[in-house]
A protein has these predicted regions:
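Extended, low-hydrophobicity, polar/charged segments
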Residues: 1-176
Length: 176
């Protein structure tokens, strides 16, 4: 009888991420706040923070491929139309164990910054064009008790340093 091995802790947690960003010149501003699990819960908090706020969907397709869609919080992401656009099969939400194994976060803390915990690039990153075009983007720093604001230069530097080029999709037009 074989036992499942526990998933090892992720390489990066909030503190290690913040130290890594500082060391690599990825400048952002982090605001601590009460835990936020859904976009609607954080609306009042976000009103005081400039920039585009995000919703992040951790998804799996029928072939087992993993996807992270990061979109502006008010963007409609049509999960019936998205597969054709991004080249996937039917999408469904990935489970929490897989989320932790690949991005090193728990439900409610899904974030593009979690891609730093996926050096094997198991997760394909899809970014809403509204975020790609925003002056400032806001993501959880691997925990839903804080939000980190990055200007576009810092965000793109982060992606470049971890070797990620997002697939940019205009979800606003897709929902059309």
């Amino acid at each position: 009888m074989t036992e499942d091995k526990p998933t090892p802790p992720p390489a990066f947690d909030r503190d290690r991420l913040m130290a890594w960003m500082d060391e690599h010149g990825v400048v952002g501003t982090t605001h601590d706040h009460p835990a936020v699990f859904r976009v609607e819960e954080g609306l009042e908090l976000k009103a005081a923070m400039p920039g585009a706020h995000t919703k992040n969907l951790f998804l799996k397709d029928r072939k087992g491929r993993l996807w992270l869609i990061s979109a502006r919080q008010d963007t409609i992401v049509d999960l019936k139309r998205a597969p054709k656009t991004i080249g996937s099969e039917k999408l469904s939400f990935g489970n929490e164990a897989l989320l932790y194994e690949t991005l090193g976060v728990r439900g409610g803390s899904v974030t593009a910054l979690g891609l730093i915990n996926d050096p094997d690039r198991r997760v394909t990153f899809v970014l809403d064009k509204a975020l790609w075009d925003a002056d400032i983007v806001n993501f959880h720093p691997l925990t839903n008790t804080a939000t980190t604001a990055l200007d576009q230069t810092a965000f793109r530097r982060f992606l470049s340093l971890i070797g990620r080029e997002p697939m940019v999709v205009d979800f606003g037009q897709l929902a059309g």
